[in-house]
Amino acid sequence: MALRFILGRAGTGKTRLCLEEIRKELRQAPDGPPLVFLVPEQATFQTEYALALTPGLSGMFRAQVLSFRRLAWRVFSEVGGAARPHVGDVGKRMMLARILARRRNELRLFGRAAGQYGFSGTLAGVLSELKTYLVTPEALEQAVRMLPGTAETDSLQAKLEDLRLLYTDFERELAGKYIDPDDYLTLLAARLGESPTLRAAEVWVDGFAGFTPQEYAVLEALLKAAARVNVALCLDPRSGRREDLELFQVTRDTRARLAELARKNGVELERPVELAGPPARFRANPALAHLEREFFRRPTKKFAGPPENLRLVAAASRRAEVEGAAREILRLSRERGWRWRDVSLVVRNLADYHELVATVFADYGIPCFIDRKRPVRHHPLVELIRSALETVTENWTYDPVFRYLKTDLVPVSRGDVDLLENYVLAHGIKGAKWADPEDWHYRRSDALNRPVPNGTGAPAPSDRDRYLREKVNRIRRRAARHLLDFQRRVQAAGTVRELTAALYDLLSDLDVPGRIEEWSREAETEGRLEAAREHRQLWDGVVELLDQVVETLGDEALTPEEYGRILDSGMDGLQLALIPPALDQVLVGSLERSRNPDIRAAFVLGVSEGVLPGRHGGTGLFTDREREVLLAAGLEVAPDTRRKVYEEQYLVYIALTRAGHYLWVSYPLADEEGGALAPSSVIPRLRELFPGLREETLALEPEGTAPGADLPYVTAPGRTLGFLVTRLRDWKSGVTVDPVWWSVFNWFAAHAGWRERCAPVLAGLFYENREPRLDPELTPELYGSRLVVSVSRLEEFRGCPFAHFARYALRLKERDVCRLAAPDIGLFFHAALKTFEDRLREAGMEWDALESADCTRLASAVVEELAPQLQSEVLLSSPRLRFLTGKLERVVERTAGVMAAHARHSRFQPVAVEVAFGPGRDVPGPAYPLPGGGSVELAGRIDRVDVAHTDNAAYLRVIDYKAGPRSLALDDVYYGLNLQLLVYLEAGLREAAALAGRECRPAGAFYFRVQNPLLKGGTPVPPAEVAPRLLKAFRLQGLVLDDPALLRLMDDAIGSESAIVPAGLKQDGTVKKKPGVVSAAQLERLQEHVRRVVAETAAEIQAGVVAIAPYRKGQANACRYCAFKPVCAFDPLLESNRYRQLRALTAGELWRLLGLPEEDEPGDE
């Protein structure tokens, strides 16, 4: 029994010495005693590979490269001790979730967190840490007693008591039945001495700076059992400088502790091997040798001259940083002939970089292996399991059903799934309807607007409707068959074992194993080796998960919801740990995990403040302060703050001394959101050590103008093509660009394979997103030979001609969804008020005689009658929408009450409601001649026409109901963006004889908001003020003539302000100037202008104008709520895409443009 240390600074050859000694033993006695090389888990593959490459070896039977965990399995296979089922991370999470649910009400501190998603995973991590530090439940109990009873420790005491309770329960559930992998090393330490293999073995330990208490226990057992243990440690064996002592404090502590264990157990402490000379790794590179030796030493010894093979880079962003590293790796490969495996890229926070590295390296054609455990939450198999369970527990709601169908693991094509999804959304299908044995026979209808008769007389479905219905029913049966079988099995299951069997049957019925294997083979064929192994590993992981569920919870009775939550927690814990699938790859890893012997170049990225060296706060359940208190109480649960500082220093040292030939150190100046990032203290230290080091700045895109300035960006063809497009766009904008890009352009043009890819990309540079006019012969086919248009259609054209083209020519529309949206509510209110008016007439009642009780009774009857007719009974489809029905009823009731109040104060009375005008409707619509010949006829529906009679004349006004706030801006009328009220007024006046029995004069045109307003105020509203304030809340908005007598017809109580119309009278009885008040001449001029706008707009439609030309007026623009943005691809950054800027007009400017004299601006005189 002997212990020998192999000591040396970074690069002195400690690992090489270990390997050479093992090789020498293998050559001298291939069948001699075992040789064990103990290394960190992540280094086993590379170390084994390095040993296997040794020339001249006749065999490696004696040598074994092992991690602590693999050593445990080797010993257990010899001496036993691990026959019980093993509970992995997933099984532990599920077991702890059950314990938390059982103990939740007894926990002092964790009671609330116990039910939170993911807490069982946090708890599993804490228990793992406790076991790593050999802390037992009894030790926790002892620590509670040792804590001082202060306010500071109350929370810690509660935390420890909860942990002791949960830890005890966990151990009790394991006892005699299962083995926790976190106990492997504890068991190994106890049984290692029984291993016949290790008694005569020689062991080398390399790659560690320190060990956990569990690992120290194993090493102690090894010292007592093995013939000799060699431990390689990175430290300077001869330097007594304070800086060196601090730098290697971690490894010095490790050496001291191991030496103490040797002395304690009577193990001979051999003379150490001291590799004290200059590190061989940096022999050919003086700058890197200087960096290794002097980085932590004071006073600073500066390096003379520019350092070769050392680069310091400040990047605009993390992406620019990774792209710059990728370009440099390509350069090193091409110019120096280095293999990919000669290069390592390390970062401290891999989570910030791994997706960027994977994407960018793929763009540059650099093969890489990212050393991290892959979460599997994204994988279709996990989504299939999760969504299948949710479908059953949530009664077949839309979201889980279609997540299940879109996994590509169900025998339904994506096209069929899309068709089925559209049908289901349009008809609101969910729940038991999926299990209906009869065919689905749903009709998409809107009974409030386009009634479809039920029963006899209903229009027969078209051939297309029948074909679609038959196809949808075939698809839905195929889609739901396995899921319905799964639901029946789940409903019949009583235990976890039966629920798991039901789930496994579903996976088997769908042939998931075969499909996963097929995906894996496809990925291998395409060269995506990591993806291929991911698929296979995940299937094995899921099967193991199901086994653990049954093993740990098999006979427990759980509801499907509880089972789903436990399984969800287990799948969250599933992670894939892959070995490098190829030998020649750039290895990418976090600084703590990566072990790369014999690399030439190291790229250290992300050297930002607080990252390297890192800041430390509490992790897991304990804060740093709590760990210090526990250490004082005799309980070690993690390194203290002082040791962490030393560990950070050591990590910086390791990062900077990885490679012997080339070192790249970089930091980003900003994060993904543009927030500034400061460089680490490492950066100014490098500047101080190397005055001749030129710090480079990397932009994401090339920006050079001088010849050759952008040459570093010319690397991989795929990425270079993107840069070429950027630079040519700059050139097109008048910017001087590096001439190298013309050579790049010529290269792409000369290479056939790239010429085809390059052509459409470069064509985009000169593409103008414009739409030419339609062929004159095509327009009549699209719009018909006779132009009949609605006002909203004209307004849409004025907003953007292309939006009109998309809706009315291409007939594009968003897919139907059975839900209650704002247009549906507006439609409901229109129908409700019309029905209310009909019921009034049937009862022989007038509006002005309507009482509050009448409003309540009629509103209830109307809403009850109409609710089933809206959107396939959408108002009856859920408790929330049934509650909303009650609110809609109160709105109708309140609105009717206000309309009755209007009637009592006004001579205007409704003469017609829901007046449809246009060809074949209630009355003809306005028709206007077009400049090029022909005419346009307008169609629409006026919500209400009111008339007031005097001795001399009759006056007509139109009212349009709105479910939301709406006002009339006269400049919107001028620009054609709001034509509705003026067109409706003209339509009413033209057909006044038919509607009112006589010709009428115009009185006004208004919006009436249907609402149940909340009267706001700092104090309760006095009862006497409620009615007047309600009237004001319902005040009509729009246009009214400036005739005092006419205003009194509309509001017999009008004063300085009307509660009914947007007008008021001065003290002298004349009309106040307000935005909505116009003279008869002004109204006539507005109507003339509207006629002209209608004719011009119709002429442009006939002429085939489809320009992508949305308007912008102030903050408003045509694109804000447009559904066709993905179709037109309007981009204001393109020169060819610009908004039509419409200037807001004052009233004076408006009348001047219409040829009338300017007047004083309206106000609230």
Curated annotation (Swiss-Prot):
Q: Which amino acid positions bind [4Fe-4S] cluster, per UniProt?
A: C800, C1119, C1122, C1128
Q: Which residues bind ATP?
A: G8, R9, A10, G11, T12, G13, K14, T15
Look up the record and name the cofactor or cofactors this protein needs: Mg(2+); [4Fe-4S] cluster
One GO BP annotation is: double-strand break repair via homologous recombination
Per UniProt, residues of the UvrD-like helicase C-terminal domain are: 279-584
Q: What does this protein do?
A: The heterodimer acts as both an ATP-dependent DNA helicase and an ATP-dependent, dual-direction single-stranded exonuclease. Recognizes the chi site generating a DNA molecule suitable for the initiation of homologous recombination. The AddB subunit has 5' -> 3' nuclease activity but not helicase activity.
Name of the protein in question: ATP-dependent helicase/deoxyribonuclease subunit B
Q: Which gene encodes it?
A: addB
